[in-house]
Amino acid sequence: SHSKHHATYVKGVNDAIAKLEEARANGDHGAIFLHEKNLAFHLGGHVNHTIWWKNLSPHGGDKPTGDLAAAIDDQFGSFDNFRAQFTAAANGLQGSGWAVLGYDTLGDRLLTFQLYDQQANVPLGIIPLLLVDMWEHA
C-alpha cells in the first residue's frame, strides 16, 4: 500500500538522523558521510513520494488549466510538446529515478529534468511541480 511504502522512507529518515547524531558525537567522520548519504536517499524518497501522491488522480489527469496551462503553452509551444518532452525524460532514465516538471525561480520558466534514484538532486532554485515515479516497482 502507499502508506506502508511511504512509511519505509520516514523510518529510514529517522534512523539515519539518529545514526548521524551518534557518528557526529563520536567523531566518526567515515560514518558521518555514509549516514548523510542514507539520509539524502530516504529524505528524497519521502519528499518525492509526497509530491507524487498529490499528483495522482483516481480518474486520471487531463490537461492543466489556468496559469500552468498558459506557462506550458508559452514555454513548450503546446501541451503535446510538453508531454513529448516529459515522456522522453521519463523513458530516458537509466536505472531508477523520476521525471520532473519544475519551476525555475531564477529563470522564471518551466523545466523538465530527471532525478536519479531518490537523491534530492533537484537543481538549485527549482520547485518540483509534477513527478512521475520511474522505479521498476512503480
Swiss-Prot record:
Q: Which family does it belong to?
A: Belongs to the iron/manganese superoxide dismutase family.
Stored InterPro entries: Fe/Mn_Superoxide_Dismutase, Mn/Fe_SOD, Mn/Fe_SOD_C, Mn/Fe_SOD_N, Mn/Fe_SOD_N_sf, SOD_C_sf
Record-annotated residues binding Mn(2+)?
2, 49, 133, 137
For molecular function, the Gene Ontology terms on record are: metal ion binding; superoxide dismutase activity
Which segment of the chain is annotated as a signal peptide?
none
* Cofactors (names): Mn(2+)
Q: What is the lineage of its organism?
A: Bacteria, Bacillati, Actinomycetota, Actinomycetes, Mycobacteriales
Catalytic reaction equation(s): 2 superoxide + 2 H(+) = H2O2 + O2
Protein role: Destroys superoxide anion radicals which are normally produced within the cells and which are toxic to biological systems.
EC number of this enzyme: 1.15.1.1
Q: What organism is recorded for this protein?
A: Mycolicibacterium phlei
Q: How is the cofactor bound, in the record's words?
A: Binds 1 Mn(2+) ion per subunit.
According to the UniProt record, which cysteines are disulfide-bonded?
none
- Keyword annotations for this protein? Manganese, Metal-binding, Oxidoreductase
Which of the seven top EC classes does this enzyme belong to?
Answer: oxidoreductase
Q: What is this protein called?
A: Superoxide dismutase [Mn]
